[in-house]
Amino acid sequence: MSKQYETVIGLEVHVELATKTKIFCGCSTAFGGAPNTHTCPVCTGMPGSLPVLNKQVVEYAMAVGLAANCQINQYCKFDRKNYFYPDNPQNYQISQLYLPICHDGWVEIETESGIKKKVGIHEIHMEEDAGKLVHDEWEDCSLVDYNRSGVPLIEIVSEPDMRSAEEVIAYLEKLRLIIQYLGASDCKLQEGSMRADVNISVREVGASEFGTRTEMKNINSFKAIAHAIEGETRRWDDNKESSKAMRSKEDAQDYRYFPDPDLTPVVISDEWIARIRAAQPELRTEKMVRYISEFDLPQYDAQILTNSKHMADVFEETVKLCGKPKEASNWLMVEAMRLLKEHEMDPDDMGFSPANLAKLIQMVAAGEINRTMAKTVFEEIFEHNVDPAVYVEEKGLKVVNDEGALKATIEGILAANPQSVADYKGGKEKAIGFLVGQTMKAMKGKADPGMVNKLLKELLAK
């Protein structure tokens, strides 16, 4: 009888926190600056420089820990992780090994195939990021940008509770949404503000011992993570979609950790924890439940709208301004999602103002513009954030509500299409659809289809 094996997966997720300054100095954390412009003696490891802990980093770490059902260590310390690499100017990284800020938590995940389970959080610790190596193939050299050096990170270390790529993606999505809703990070994988190391082993089903662990590092997209789980202990190259041999998986002794002598322990009071807990915002699950009960949205719509914090914010602000939750949901679920797909954009990248969407919804409800024209206007809102009232006025898109003008146009259409008139009067109800279409075409889409239908039936009944 052949043996059955299972994959055992754990993750180390690195998240850049959304502080304005670095973890141990006052340098900016803004992404995209010119190389080596956001640096100082502290984050470049100059002799004699001393670190000062950023309080906001501690509070973000606590907030994430509480949202992930972790215990908060009320006495935590920083340690030096010693290694030599060009992007590490100090030759050590300030991290937390012995007393991390959070431990023993869990999050509940649900996969696309409907599997529900809890994934344990072993610990969350604070640390500083390294610089960035830039490889110049033309000059055959490597350059170092220290702007990222000292940017605050939390590392979320899971228990080895996942068994498939599907579960891993569900876990990462759960973490991403928790952290985004807390405002602790934007979790933009393409900018490196969320990265994952994947630890994989294989063992017999039912065995308690783990197999030899392998590690995939430098993975910053969910697609790449799914691919990487097929690999072994190597460094994932996203450009080549392959892995390459790296150093073996290190243990703590390889880094010669010791307590950082320049940083005092962090003492966290019960009152501080209570204040952070009280300030926790509504997270994705609670928001989704509220959308269903308060706005009477279908569960599917609530899931999609809350799957991006930015999308949820746009929805709520639009509803606040126009008071029409179902219409706001429909525009975002149908037209916005269509345009996002066409432009290959993420919902977090939508740049239009909720006020303009709310105004468009109100204009449709007031009969100032029909839905067909409104779709064209929404595209302009989506792409250029135009004011719909101004755009409609400039382009002459307002609905023609002049009954006399509509009747005159319809009479011309009836005169030009005697066969369709005869078909309708002969009992072919579908013939009126053709006549409505011809009228709308003649009016360049600026007529109210309902009024056109009503007037056509009145004139055909004569």
Task: Identify the role of each PLM range.
Residues K3, Y146-V151, L189-A196, V205-G206, ...:
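C-terminal non-catalytic interaction appendages of large macromolecular assemblies
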